[in-house]
Amino acid sequence: MRIEALNTAPDATEARFEEQIRPQKMGDFAGQKKLIDNLKVFITAARKRGEALDHVLLSGPPGLGKTTLAHIIAAEMGGSIKITSGPLIDKAGNLAGLLTSMKKGDILFIDEIHRLAPAVEEYLYSAMEDYRIDILLDSGPASRAVQLKLEPFTLVGATTRAGLLTSPLRARFGINSRLDYYNPELLQSIIIRAAGILNIGIDEDAAMEIARRSRGTPRIANRLLRRARDFAQVAGDASISLAVARRTLESLEIDEGGLDDMDKKILEAIVRKFNGGPVGLASLAVSVGEEQDTIEEVYEPYLIQMGYLSRTPRGRVATRLAMSRFAHPGISSQGSLFDTAEDG
């Protein structure tokens, strides 16, 4: 059975839950202290000058709070927020419709901004830099360009793959911030707060047990909390105890390091099938039956963070930690005799 408890992509139910528990002010946002402190300064200064906040780029693994921060920025600036994503804006005309509806101080949040089409991205340059866009009227020989002025707005872009952003787009963001994984103590406080909103009690040690297995990601921590609530309620328990938390995590096949079934498949494939690597992404994806993008964006960041995996120019390589844990007895942990070339 494939377990999806550690997938960092939100489903519709989860999106509604995140809306319910989302912090409304900078002071309520847990973690990312340096980033938050800097944003407070930038927002306060922009408000004192009566100006729109500089455009903000938020990067980092999924599920760490980029969308939440965009909402908080809009609230702190006293503007409205319009939400879209890179793949949804497939034509410059779609972007023009969004931009012309913005009022002074509004926030345009583009998730997965690295997936903007090149033509749409170029159309965004003048909007970000000069608050203007050029619209082409009619077609053929009678066509003419009309320049439209825009109200000063703030673009907040979110990306899990900052390296895919073009230099011209990246250069137009005045504020560039990266979100990092959370430590267990911060996740514990997030879990306890969310449990209060869900009207279910949770023991501190139970919250810490869930936190330790949440891959440093609030979205996963909140998802595991909801599953633990299910186990507690079915068992007739009024609150989530340590025993309930452990039973939940064991049932979801999440080990003490936060690794799930697919994490283990990836590491076992590299260690056992490819003798530790290097192995190309395409070969690895076929081996474990998962999409390349999912491996690269969802699974690899945490495996690298935890010291199980390295990316090299020739492919993915298992570290000594991974070799010692996942190698069959008798297999060397020194790496491959024959290197596998990178193919993705």
Curated annotation (Swiss-Prot):
Amino acids binding ATP: 21-22, 63, 66-68, 129-131, 172, 182, 219
A GO cellular-component term linked to this record: cytoplasm
Taxonomy, superkingdom: Bacteria
SMART domains cross-referenced by the UniProt entry: AAA
Catalysis: reaction(s): ATP + H2O = ADP + phosphate + H(+)
Region (Head domain (RuvB-H)): 256-344
GO biological process, one term: DNA repair
Principal subcellular localisation of the protein: cytoplasm
Residues holding DNA: 311, 316
Binding residues annotated for Mg(2+), in chain numbering: 67
UniProt region (Small ATPAse domain (RuvB-S)), positions on chain: 183-253
Keyword set includes Hydrolase: yes
GO molecular function (one): four-way junction DNA binding
Region ranges (Large ATPase domain (RuvB-L)): 1-182
Function: The RuvA-RuvB-RuvC complex processes Holliday junction (HJ) DNA during genetic recombination and DNA repair, while the RuvA-RuvB complex plays an important role in the rescue of blocked DNA replication forks via replication fork reversal (RFR). RuvA specifically binds to HJ cruciform DNA, conferring on it an open structure. The RuvB hexamer acts as an ATP-dependent pump, pulling dsDNA into and through the RuvAB complex. RuvB forms 2 homohexamers on either side of HJ DNA bound by 1 or 2 RuvA tetramers; 4 subunits per hexamer contact DNA at a time.
Subunit structure: Homohexamer. Forms an RuvA(8)-RuvB(12)-Holliday junction (HJ) complex. HJ DNA is sandwiched between 2 RuvA tetramers; dsDNA enters through RuvA and exits via RuvB. An RuvB hexamer assembles on each DNA strand where it exits the tetramer. Each RuvB hexamer is contacted by two RuvA subunits (via domain III) on 2 adjacent RuvB subunits; this complex drives branch migration. In the full resolvosome a probable DNA-RuvA(4)-RuvB(12)-RuvC(2) complex forms which resolves the HJ.
Protein name listed in UniProt: Holliday junction branch migration complex subunit RuvB
Protein species of origin: Chlorobaculum tepidum (strain ATCC 49652 / DSM 12025 / NBRC 103806 / TLS)
Gene: ruvB
